[in-house]
């Protein structure tokens, strides 16, 4: 089963992905994690990626696809994967279709987490990130157990440039312009479920699981209340 957890910046994709990969026992393929690995390693690719992210721009398709295709070639993806934050453009979606088709696979289900823009900005503004593992926190919505330290590895948390309010709005604008058309691509394949992303983490998680269960029972392209 190949799932894609889809939604705007600040919609909670990463939080829900952490649960879903364990629940379904499939690896998570996150472009964010892959990019952070390149940045941490100090590779030329990582330097290029960092420049785009610091400006609030999307990483170009050719760079993203190179990293993703390499990951899909790993043995642990044969049972299926959970795409988190990918694909983000129609070109990426079409390229992913071709890559998966060459492996006799496909994207089986797209979960679209919907959140109002102003709520997204509120969630993103002030968000803190662990530079070591990539886990995110929020002083009010999801605070760490220890002040400004990662719960997982104790690393000091930082505020990324792309999580400042002005950059957050720009990222959302870029998303609306370039990423929403991906939904139309997958709706043509009848694999999309819309999920309300407002409310608590557990509440949203329940809606996502309900959507996946609905797909298994043959329901699709229906809002999940």
Describe every region a protein language model picked out.
Residues 1-225:
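Glycine-rich phosphate-binding loop of ATP-dependent small-molecule kinases
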